[in-house]
């Protein structure tokens, strides 16, 4: 539930996302939001309904709240594909709306995909987009240990900066003993691709 308050803390309205393929909201992840043009974009994580393999998997969850009437649209809660920004498991979610009004998200994935996933909508939320890996971690699909922490997303006039730390060992990392190096990556707005990331 998203609750709208006045600046003097009067409760004005609310929006509720029901069902949404969710058994546990915010499971094993974070929460981020961004506001632009009367829209509140929300990205978090959730544990999903039992799948055909008998398990409840975790993934990213995103939706848009229209602040004027508190309606919800563009809820992305189902198992999907990279063109929708889907990440599973998604252990951290960061998001911004860029100067051109495009939604940009950064997730820490361990399976689909396994790495720091940068996603940009082709326009406002709800439209398809492009997903690329800023960094990838060795290990089997879904191995929770990645040896990484994905912690920063910012926009420049010409691109996007992403920050993460990484042991370099992927699933073989010893999280309490291994040294983590800190990385800052740049992805060009005009070449939003693997080759446009350095």
Region locations from a protein language model:
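Extracellular, repeat-based ectodomains that mediate carbohydrate processing or recognition
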Residues: 1-198
């Amino acid at each position: 539930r998203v609750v709208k308050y006045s600046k003097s803390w009067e409760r004005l309205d609310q929006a509720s996302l029901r069902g949404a393929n969710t058994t546990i909201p915010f499971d094993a992840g974070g929460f981020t939001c961004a506001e632009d043009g009367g829209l509140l974009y929300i990205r978090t994580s959730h544990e999903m309904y039992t799948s055909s393999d008998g398990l409840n998997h975790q993934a990213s969850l995103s939706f848009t709240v229209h602040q004027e009437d508190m309606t919800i649209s563009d809820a992305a809660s189902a198992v999907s594909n990279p063109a929708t920004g889907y990440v599973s498991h998604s252990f951290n979610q960061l998001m911004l709306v860029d100067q051109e009004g495009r939604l940009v998200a950064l997730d820490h994935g361990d399976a689909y995909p396994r790495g720091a996933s940068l996603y940009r909508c082709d326009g406002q939320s709800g439209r398809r987009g492009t997903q690329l890996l800023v960094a990838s971690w060795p290990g089997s699909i879904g191995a929770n240990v990645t040896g990484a922490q994905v912690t920063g997303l910012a926009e420049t006039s010409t691109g996007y900066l992403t920050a993460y730390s990484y042991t370099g060992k992927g699933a073989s990392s010893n999280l309490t003993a291994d040294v983590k190096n800190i990385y800052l990556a740049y992805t060009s707005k005009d070449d939003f691709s693997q080759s446009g990331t350095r």
